[in-house]
Regions:
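Positively charged n-region of N-terminal signal peptides that target proteins for export
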Residues: 1-4
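Bacterial N-terminal signal peptides
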Residues: 7-18
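Predominantly soluble domains enriched in secretory-pathway, periplasmic, or organellar proteins
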Residues: 19-226
Length: 226
C-alpha cells in the first residue's frame, strides 16, 4: 500500500486595495495566508491516514511587494485542518490582523487515531515584524468557516459541532468573544453581506442558508432560512 504524504494547504488572502475596489499598484503589500495540514493523507484507494498532530503551520506570504517573487514572511507553528478550510482563515481589510480557526484535532486511543472537534481560534498580529500569534480564543466546537466585516470590527465563526455562530468584537489587536448565536442545526460557514447588516450561514447537512440580522454588535437569527 502506498501512501501519498503531502502538506494539505488552504489559502486565504485579502488585499486592502481589493476590499476598497482599487487596483493594487506594484510594490504595495498584499498578504496571503497558507494553512498547512501536515497530519492527514490518503492511500491510493482513498482511505484517510492520520498522523500525530503537532507539525501543522500557517505561513504569511507577501505576494504584492514583488509579484514575481512572493516572499514567505513567517511560518507559525499553529494547528489547523483541511476539514475546515478554505474558509477558516480571514484577514482584516487593513491587513493588520488575521484569524485562523482550528476545526479538528487528532487524538490517539489504544493505538487508534481519530479526529475530534477543537474549539480554538488563533489571532495573528500581521502588523508586527515578523507577524506573530497574539491570542488564542475558545469559541464553539469545531469552528469552521469564518468572516470579518469590511469595517474590521466584527467577526463571525460557524461552529459545526456546536450548531452555533460565535460573534467576535475586533478592536485594534484585541479580539473578544461577545456572543454565541444558536442556529439549531450544524453550520459550516458564515459570511457578511457587503453592507455588513446581514450575514448568511450555510447549513450544509440540510442544504439550507440561514439569514442573520446584524445591528452594530448584535447578531440575531430569526429562524429565516433560504
Amino acid at each position: 500500500m502506498r501512501l501519498r504524504f503531502f502538506a494539505l494547504g488552504t489559502l486565504a488572502f485579502a488585499v486592502l486595495s481589493g476590499c476598497t475596489g482599487m487596483t493594487p499598484t506594484p510594490g504595495q503589500r498584499q498578504l496571503l495566508l497558507v494553512a498547512n495540514d501536515e497530519k492527514q493523507s490518503w492511500t491510493d484507494a482513498g482511505a484517510v491516514v492520520l498522523a500525530a498532530h503537532g507539525r501543522d503551520n500557517v505561513q504569511v506570504i507577501d505576494i504584492g511587494t514583488d509579484p514575481l517573487a512572493p516572499r514567505n514572511v513567517v511560518t507559525l507553528p499553529l494547528d489547523n485542518t483541511i476539514a475546515g478550510p478554505p474558509t477558516n482563515l480571514a484577514i482584516t481589510a487593513d491587513e493588520k490582523l488575521a484569524l485562523v480557526a482550528n476545526s479538528l484535532n487528532v487524538v490517539e486511543e489504544n493505538g487508534v487515531r481519530r479526529q475530534v472537534p477543537d474549539n480554538r481560534l488563533f489571532v495573528i498580529d500581521l502588523a508586527a515584524t515578523p507577524p506573530k500569534l497574539v491570542d488564542t480564543l475558545a469559541v464553539g466546537r469545531q469552528p469552521s468557516g469564518l468572516s470579518i466585516n469590511r469595517a474590521g470590527t466584527l467577526a463571525l465563526v460557524a461552529n459545526r459541532a456546536d450548531n452555533s455562530v460565535s460573534v467576535l468584537r475586533i478592536a485594534g489587536q484585541k479580539v473578544t468573544l461577545i456572543d454565541t448565536v444558536a442556529m439549531g442545526e450544524s453550520v459550516s460557514h458564515v459570511r457578511f453581506t457587503p453592507d455588513g447588516r446581514r450575514a448568511l450561514a450555510s447549513k450544509f447537512p440540510n442544504h439550507k442558508v440561514a439569514m442573520l440580522e446584524v445591528e452594530g454588535e448584535k447578531v440575531s437569527y430569526n429562524k429565516v432560512d433560504l
